[in-house]
Each structure stands twice: as structure tokens, then as C-alpha cells.
Swiss-Prot record:
Coiled coil: none annotated. One of its GO terms (molecular function) is protein-exporting ATPase activity. Part of the Sec protein translocase complex. Interacts with the SecYEG preprotein conducting channel. Has a central role in coupling the hydrolysis of ATP to the transfer of proteins into and across the cell membrane, serving as an ATP-driven molecular motor driving the stepwise translocation of polypeptide chains across the membrane. It is found in: Cell inner membrane; Cytoplasm. It is a peripheral membrane protein. Keywords: ATP-binding, Cell inner membrane, Cell membrane, Cytoplasm, Membrane, Nucleotide-binding, Protein transport, Translocase, Translocation, Transport. It comes from the Bacteria. GO terms for biological process: intracellular protein transmembrane transport; protein import; protein targeting; protein transport by the Sec complex. It comes from Chlorobium chlorochromatii (strain CaD3). SUPFAM superfamilies: P-loop containing nucleoside triphosphate hydrolases, Pre-protein crosslinking domain of SecA. Its EC number is 7.4.2.8. InterPro entries: Helicase_ATP-bd, Helicase_C-like, P-loop_NTPase, SecA, SecA_CS, SecA_DEAD, SecA_motor_DEAD, SecA_preprotein_X-link_dom. This is Protein translocase subunit SecA 2.
Length: 662
């Protein structure tokens, strides 16, 4: 490969700063234009034309079909004049190739989705509509470019599964494909990343990106990495594994680009820091003597804690027995507030679990265990001490980057999800991703029951179990959704008391995730799941279950993002199947407790529900809506603030001549 080709493949796109002010207003207007209905209708009409053209290719021999595909591949790789005009003709051949190689004939709506991806859009397709195949149709085109296309999946299982299923199509179309999973060693990763289409999780991809940056020995501008490699690498030296960041198709895009956006991926190494460990132990011991309300106040809504005058006085009285370090008010308050925050806001079974004597973080939005993720600045050690496990050594950060910053490096970014509505403005503002809604192939047959509201959780769970028992007697499969491991375990205990058999899927019992979710559509099955609920794995109905009404999903508590509720409801009624969704909400649910005064909920709203006043359900629905809107607005502002700080730091580093830091 000649140097210019090598450089082109390894260069990284440098994004502009997030628009603000007048530029932000014009950018917002541009997003409105991109979302116009006429554009979506034009894509659907083009898709129907392609679907009709593909039917005419049924008579082609396998040899002729492949010959025409390879001819288009060469044409697109050369980017010959007018190549865009041939997208429809080439797509029709790929549709036929999919039917021959996979036994799957894409529907017009799937073709529409692929066309939208090629335009760099974010598409919303409902669960079960075949997003995996949609990504493959687009990936063939992007693979023909001669540069790598990364297909981002939720976990290693899906990366391996999708690659194995779709590899025959890629090979037939003259496109190399591979997958990168956690168990691969670095030489294997380098070979895999050379493929035209690479299936990989965001975690593995970003970690490899950071490790590549560390190999550059201070050359932190990614676009200069080839020049550094050419002039400094010797035979036998470790080399970067990535093949540039050109195109990415992100599955479950709302989870990756929004929920995980501000999460930093960190390359770190443990370091001994005995003074910090001793300070954490002393802080935990002191905090044990402090009581809420008397010594400190708790602001649940903003997750803030403040010491009272009584609290400060109590600490002052302890000073003579403490080491000199504690005589600094700033230092001791910082450590004590860390302990109090961990004690008041970090919940075992919700934020973390203790497994094999270790504190393991749970992802807030997916419910998955994150064994490689650690809290910073002493928080990890404090939680470990509070749980009575051996504290781990603190870590020294070698490199870090947030997911939202990383994905802005791609020249062509596109994605798909079943739950995009609600974050379309943010995705346009941060990533310049226009939104395209893809219609369902068949009309939805989901029945949505009106939400049920209760004064407290005890009554809510009693009603949920009563509904579950009635449905179980009918033989229908049932999926119960919870927000936390603790809640899922609590419901599991209730079902054990009722002598009901069930499957439990949460961060503790996660290894059989795909198998558990796949069986959730069998007659009479009861499945309890946290938010991890098998995104990317279809729930297929057992024969005869559709006649009973299909899968019934029961949501035990509203999430902070309404789209996560919708994602859970979307587990039922796929591809025209019947299904029913239920939701249960209590005044003492965490969402309402966080955003509304306790006195208002326990007096005014309790009285409204107790008396069943007219409009009480509409008022409760409004409260849930407002709470979810406030939660998402706060989360968005935090993500935007983090990105702006990153941009300011880049500008300072560039001014100093050292380029962006990772």
C-alpha cells in the first residue's frame, strides 16, 4: 500500500465545536429541514422502486448476480463520476443477494432504512423490524469504499452473532468482514480491523482507540499518527490496530450516543496511595457519627448534600483526635461529603452489586454489570469500605475520552434504534444526525392499557402480582420490567411466595441473557428483567401464543427517560404480532420523589388519588411526564457541559502547541 493510501485510511475527522448563538440557531433550523416529511416520503418511494427492481433479478444466475455486484463494487471504490446515480441499481442487486445468501428478502421499509443510513441519518425502527439486516445493506455500500465501516453493537454476543449471520452476504458482495470481541489479543484485533466491515462494541472500539493514542508517545493529534509511525517505528514494535475512523453504523444509537455519551472510557493502571486509603478509612469512621437532618441535609432532586451548623460543630469537636490532614476544612469536608454522597445516593442492587468480594458498578440505563468501570477520586474505595470489602488500589489515568467526543471523530456517522423520539434535537445538536422515522412493515397490534396509579409501592406490587396471576392462568407469556436489581429480586421473592416459576434476568444473572429473552415468548413463561432486557434479541412467540394475545409486558416503575419505557413496551407486538403493555406507578416511586416535594405528593396527590377525584389520572400522567422531562433536561445539560469543557481544553492545548489530549 502506498503512503498516501495508508495515511488516508488512518486519518481522523476533526469535528467543529458544538454550535451556539446565531450559528446554533441556523443549525437548529437546518435540523428542521432535514426532518421534513417530504424527504421521508421520497426515501420510501425510492425504496419501493428498488424493491420492484430486485424482483426482476430473481431470474439472474448466481454467477451473473455476483459479477454485477463486483462490477458495482469496483465502480464505487473508484468513486467514478456519477456513482451516486447507481445506488438504486446496486441496492436492488444487494437485496437479491440477501435473499440468495441469507434467505431474507428485505422489505421496502428496510430498504428505506438502509438508504437513510447511507445519507448519514439516525433512523427509528420499531423492535423486530429487522434493523440487523438494514445495517448490513448499508454496510455493503460503505465497505465498497475501500475504508473500514464499524458496525457498533450492544455487546460481544451480538457482534459475534451478527457477523456470523451476515458474513455470507458480505463475501458474496466482495466485502471483507470481521468482528472484534473482548477475548481477542492485539495482533488478532489488528487483523480484524483491516476488514471492510467490522462488528464491535463501543467499549472495545474506544479502548482500542485510546491504546493506539498511547502508542504515539505524545503525538496526540490523531491525523498525524501515520507520519509518526513511518518515522519512529522499528521492526517488532507494537503498532496501532485501528484502520482509521471513517464510517460507523451505531445500533441502539440512543443508548450509545445519549445514555452513555458522557461516560468516560478510561485506560488506567492501579497505583499505591496509602495516604488516600487511610484518609478514606478515617472519613468512613467519622461519617458514621453523622445523622441526616441533624448533621447534614439531603437534596434528592439535585443529588446534593450540605453540612449543617450542628454537623460542622460536631466535626470541630473531633479535630483534636485527628491527624493534621483533617485540620484543613476544605479537605475534610470534601472527603466527608464523598462518604455521605455514597451512603445516601449509591444503592446496592441499583448502582452496584457485591460479587466475589468486589464492588461492581451497574450501568444505570442498561442494568448491565460494568466490571472494568471504576468510580474516581476515592469514591470507589469509600463504597468498598462501606460494604465491608477489601478496598482496591486507586487508579492512575493514562488516557480517557467520553463516548460522545469519540463518535464525533467519524466522517460518516449514522445509527438506528427503536426509541429515538425524545432525543432527536440533542442528536442533531451534538452529532448533526438528522432523524428519519421508518414506518412498520405491518400495522402494530399492540394494546396499551391505561397506567395504574397507587398511593404506595405495596399496593402497586399487589396489583401487579394480581394481574400477573390472572394472565398466567390464561397461559400467555409475561415479561416484567424493573429499574433495578433490588426491585427485580423483590418481585422474584413475591413470585416464589405464590409458588410461580419464573426466569430472572438482571446484572447478577446476566450470562444467559440472550437465551432467557428468546424463551420469554413461550407459552406460560414468566420473565423478570431489568433495563438490560435483551436489546438486540428478538422475542419470538411460540406457536399458538399469538391466538392467546401474544406477549404481555408489565412495567413495574417508570424510568427517568420515557423512551426507555417505550423500549420496554416494544418487546411485545413485533412484526404484526399481538401484545399488551401495562404500567404501574406509585407516589413513592423514585422518579416522582426526586422531582416533587414530599409534602405535595403525600398530602395533595395522595388525597386526589384516595378520593378518585375527576382528572386524577390525567394529573398523575402529567406529573410523570414532567418528571421525565426534567430528568432528561438535566442529563442533557450535563452532557453538553462536559462536551464544551472538552472543546475548551482542546483549544487551550492547541494554543500551547500540544494538540488535543486523550
Amino acid at each position: 500500500m502506498i503512503p498516501s493510501q495508508e495515511y488516508r485510511k488512518s486519518v481522523v475527522h476533526q469535528p467543529e465545536n458544538v454550535p451556539s448563538g446565531f450559528r446554533g440557531a441556523t443549525h437548529w433550523l437546518a435540523g428542521k429541514v432535514h426532518r421534513r416529511q417530504s424527504k421521508q416520503q421520497a426515501l420510501l418511494e425510492q425504496a419501493h422502486t428498488i424493491h420492484t427492481a430486485a424482483e426482476a433479478h430473481r431470474t439472474l444466475s448466481l454467477v451473473d448476480l455476483q459479477a454485477q455486484l463486483l462490477s458495482f463494487r469496483d465502480h464505487f471504490r473508484r468513486r467514478a463520476r456519477g456513482y451516486e446515480q447507481h445506488i438504486s441499481a446496486a441496492m436492488a442487486l444487494i437485496v437479491e443477494a440477501s435473499h440468495r445468501q441469507l434467505g431474507l428478502r428485505p422489505f421496502p421499509v428496510q430498504i428505506m432504512g438502509a438508504l437513510a443510513l447511507l445519507e448519514g441519518s439516525l433512523i427509528e425502527m420499531q423492535t423486530g423490524e429487522g434493523k440487523t439486516l438494514v445495517a448490513a445493506l448499508a454496510a455493503v455500500f460503505l465497505g465498497w469504499s475501500g475504508r473500514s465501516c464499524h458496525v457498533i453493537t450492544v455487546n460481544d454476543y451480538l457482534a459475534s452473532r451478527d457477523y456470523a449471520r451476515l458474513e455470507p452476504l458480505y463475501t458474496f458482495c466482495g466485502v471483507t468482514a470481521s468482528c472484534v470481541i473482548g477475548e481477542l489479543k492485539r495482533p488478532e484485533r489488528q487483523r480484524s480491523y483491516q476488514a471492510a466491515v467490522v462488528y464491535v462494541t463501543s467499549k472495545e472500539l474506544v479502548a482500542d482507540f485510546l491504546k493506539d493514542r498511547l502508542l504515539l508517545h505524545g503525538v496526540s493529534d490523531p491525523s498525524r499518527h501515520f507520519l509518526h509511525s513511518s518515522n519512529t517505528l522499528r521492526e517488532g514494535d507494537e503498532v496501532p490496530v485501528l484502520n482509521g475512523l471513517w464510517a460507523a453504523i451505531v445500533d441502539e444509537a440512543d443508548s450509545v450516543l445519549v445514555d452513555d455519551a458522557a461516560t468516560p472510557l478510561i485506560i488506567s493502571r492501579p497505583v499505591k496511595n496509602e495516604p488516600l486509603m487511610e484518609a478514606c478509612r478515617e472519613a468512613v469512621r467519622l461519617a458514621a457519627k453523622l445523622q441526616p437532618t441533624l448533621h447534614y441535609t439531603v437534596e434528592e432532586r439535585y443529588k446534593q448534600i450540605a453540612l449543617t451548623s450542628e454537623g460542622n460543630a460536631t466535626i470541630e469537636q473531633m479535630l483534636p483526635t485527628l491527624p493534621p490532614f483533617w485540620h484543613s476544612a476544605t479537605r475534610r469536608n470534601e472527603l466527608l461529603l464523598l462518604v455521605l454522597n455514597a451512603r445516601e445516593f449509591f444503592r446496592k442492587g441499583k448502582d452496584y452489586v457485591v460479587s466475589d468480594g468486589k464492588v461492581v458498578i451497574i450501568d444505570e440505563f442498561t442494568g448491565r454489570l460494568m466490571p472494568d468501570r471504576k468510580w474516581q477520586k476515592g469514591t470507589q474505595q469509600i463504597v468498598e469500605l462501606l460494604e465491608g470489602v477489601e478496598p482496591t488500589d486507586p487508579v492512575e489515568v493514562a488516557a480517557r475520552i467520553s463516548f460522545q467526543r469519540f463518535f464525533r471523530f467519524y466522517k460518516l456517522l449514522c445509527g438506528m434504534s427503536g426509541t429515538v423520539k425524545g432525543v432527536t434535537a440533542e442528536l442533531w445538536h451534538i452529532y448533526s444526525l438528522p432523524y428519519v422515522a421508518i414506518p412498520t412493515n405491518k400495522p402494530s397490534r399492540r394494546t396499551t392499557q391505561a397506567p395504574e396509579y397507587f398511593l404506595e409501592k405495596g399496593a402497586k406490587y399487589a396489583a401487579l402480582i394480581a394481574t400477573l396471576e390472572a394472565l398466567h392462568r390464561q397461559g400467555v407469556p409475561i415479561l416484567v420490567g424493573t429499574r433495578s436489581v433490588r426491585e427485580s429480586e423483590f418481585l422474584a421473592d413475591l413470585l416464589r411466595q405464590k409458588m410461580l416459576n419464573f426466569q430472572l434476568l438482571n446484572a447478577i444473572y446476566h450470562k444467559e441473557e440472550a437465551a432467557i429473552i428468546a424463551r420469554a415468548g413461550e407459552r406460560g413463561n414468566i420473565t423478570i428483567a431489568t433495563n438490560m432486557a435483551g436489546r438486540g434479541t428478538d422475542i419470538l412467540l411460540e406457536q399458538g401464543v399469538a391466538a392467546l394475545g401474544g406477549l404481555h409486558v408489565l412495567l413495574a416503575e417508570p424510568n427517568e427517560a420515557e423512551r426507555i419505557d417505550r423500549q420496554f413496551y416494544g418487546r411485545c407486538a413485533r412484526q404484526g404480532d399481538p401484545g399488551t403493555s401495562y404500567s404501574y406507578i406509585a407516589l413513592d416511586d423514585r422518579l416522582l420523589q426526586r422531582f416533587f416535594p414530599e409534602r405535595f405528593l403525600n398530602s395533595v396527590m395522595a388525597e386526589v388519588l384516595l378520593r378518585r377525584l375527576p382528572g386524577s389520572h390525567a394529573l398523575m400522567q402529567l406529573l410523570v411526564y414532567l418528571a421525565q422531562q426534567m430528568a432528561q433536561r438535566m442529563a442533557y445539560q450535563q452532557r453538553l457541559s462536559l462536551l464544551r469543557r472538552d472543546e475548551q481544553l482542546d483549544q487551550l492545548m492547541s494554543f500551547a502547541g500540544s494538540g488535543p489530549k486523550f
